[in-house]
UniProtKB/Swiss-Prot annotation:
Lineage, opening ranks: Archaea, Methanobacteriati, Thermoplasmatota, Thermoplasmata, Thermoplasmatales
Binding annotation for Zn(2+): H70, H72, H234, D308
Name this protein carries in UniProt: Imidazolonepropionase
Cofactors: Zn(2+); Fe(3+)
Organism, scientific name: Thermoplasma volcanium (strain ATCC 51530 / DSM 4299 / JCM 9571 / NBRC 15438 / GSS1)
Family designation: Belongs to the metallo-dependent hydrolases superfamily. HutI family.
Gene name, Swiss-Prot/TrEMBL: hutI
Length: 404
């Protein structure tokens, strides 16, 4: 098949992180046609021929399928009451210390069946796809113990088999169960990680005030590295307790949150060739101060934007995340598009297949109903996504229902 009458393809190019000035570099192919064969982009031309079965883009903009590299989208229950607590002045840390927050989701998840969690999670994923996401990272983390974590892993694998999106599975050492010692639980998590090894690609840890210490995070990630897994870390969301420095000797693909990063952290991340993932939707949910992306980009650190959808931040709309990053973190629209495509794909080890509209890559394509790509973050209040292709298959059409 082919997609014809494309107003312009707007895409970064290449297979790896874009940093510094390169993060704002995009290619433009006007009046284009995309040929799709066997789920791949076979050819891109500037011809105008039209045959039966072609899809007419009607002059719209085409961008790469968006890549959401940090999510907590698999869980049971909800935390709507917590929203009102935060609105009345309670902080994230206060709610967590009271045994709620993440711990409430742990209880809700334990009390939900795998089928219930799958159904809830697929609704959230369908919404993400409707806003242009074609690849999504799926974390465990709300089980804490092996039986419940395996339930979440099974749900993640079932989502992977749905065909709606491409997935990358991550085991997350999330929070310390009440009454457990950190050292003992870290060793226990290593055992879970070993048993999950054949089904996941990444290991992640929440290293912050009220979560795991730098020493525990380092030990866990070092163990994961020895297993050959990719490494990610939540750091500097609540406070800066030295997680970046502690893990600087490891091959961490991305340091996520980074609200309280200092100059030493930025230089460390740049020097080891890693990246920073900004999560503006969570900052929005918590009403915190947004980190300044200019500090990272101008220092030569690749910046990624992800949704961080969770019970706290019930939002997987990467276009709204781009809007927030442009408005509050001083990113250019070009940088924001790169952050949600090739940089996010590279952080998941998928840069050779995902994140750009180029010949030979997976046909993950989003048709956007705008006249210019700069309107994408601007028109955040309406869904401008017309159609979404995943591996060459139409998985979302605004005028039709999902093919679940």
């Amino acid at each position: 098949m082919k997609i014809t009458n494309i107003g312009a393809i707007v895409t970064p190019v290449g297979n790896s992180y874009h940093s510094g000035d390169k993060q704002s570099e995009l290619d433009f192919i006007e009046n284009a046609t995309i040929y799709i064969e066997n789920g791949k982009i076979a050819k891109i031309t500037r011809e105008h021929s039209s045959d039966a079965g072609d899809l007419d883009a009607e002059g719209s903009i085409v961008i790469p399928g968006l890549v959401d590299s940090h999510t907590h989208i698999i869980f049971g229950g909800n935390r709507s009451q917590e929203f009102y607590q935060r609105a009345s002045g309670y902080t994230y840390s206060e709610i967590l210390r009271s045994g709620n927050g993440i711990y409430k989701t742990v209880r809700d998840t334990a009390n939900s069946s795998a089928d219930e969690i799958f159904t809830q999670s697929m609704k959230r994923i369908a919404d993400a796809v409707s806003h242009g996401t074609t690849t999504i990272e799926l974390k465990t983390g709300y089980g804490l113990y092996e039986k419940e974590e395996r339930k979440l892993l099974d749900v993640a694998r079932k989502i992977s088999n749905s065909g709606l999106v491409s997935t990358v599975l991550t085991y997350l050492m999330h929070v310390l169960p009440e009454g457990e010692s950190e050292e003992a639980y870290e060793k226990y998590s290593e055992k879970i990680l070993s048993s999950f090894r054949n089904y996941i690609s990444f290991a992640d840890v929440f290293c912050d005030e009220g979560a795991f210490s730098p020493n525990a995070a380092k030990a866990f990630l070092k163990f994961a590295d020895n297993l050959g897994l990719g490494l990610k870390i939540h750091a500097n969301e609540i406070n800066n307790i030295g997680c970046v420095k502690a893990c600087s000797g490891l091959n961490v693909k991305s340091f996520d949150h980074m609200i309280h990063a200092n100059a030493e952290d930025v230089e460390t991340i740049r020097s080891i060739g890693s990246a920073i993932t900004l999560l503006p939707l969570t900052v929005f949910a918590l009403d915190e101060s947004y980190p300044d992306a200019r500090v990272f980009i101008d220092s030569g650190v690749p910046v990624i934007i992800a949704s961080d959808i969770s019970p706290l931040n019930y939002n997987a709309n990467l276009i709204f995340a781009m809007h927030l990053a442009v408005k509050y973190s001083s990113m250019k629209p070009e940088e924001a598009l790169t952050a949600t495509t090739i940089n996010a794909a590279s952080s998941l080890g998928l840069g050779e297949k995902k994140g750009t509209v180029e010949e030979g890559k997976d046909a993950d394509i989003v048709i956007i109903d705008v006249d210019d790509y700069t309107e994408i973050p601007y028109e955040y209040g309406i869904n401008t996504v017309k159609k979404v292709f995943h591996n060459g298959s139409l998985v979302f059409d605004r005028t039709k229902q999902f093919k679940l």
